[in-house]
Amino acid sequence: MLHTCLIDDNFKQSPADHCVYTKESKQTGKLIVVIWVDDLIIAANNTKSLEQVKTMLSTRFKMKDLGRLKHFLGMDFSQSDGCVKMSQGKYVGKILNRFDMQECRTRETPCD
């Protein structure tokens, strides 16, 4: 049902990951919808288009807008100045504790 709703609204399903849908045009800008079970992440480079997609979905489905993305699937997210930062610090901490490696030396890993 959600798949049909997105396809009817001109979203395209990613051939690489069937849980990712994209839509791009001069009118809407770039929109991305990621589905994980019953959770959605909706990203857009244009606030008006983001609100239109949320309105369209909320007329067809019961949904709750949780605002800006902060936590998803064990990852922490922060947004500022056109940048999205993702961290798995809590998960890494659990792994380090599990293998008694709390004192190991860290290294930064940039992501392009």
Where do the language-model regions lie?
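Long, low-complexity, charge-biased intrinsically disordered regions
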Residues: 1-112
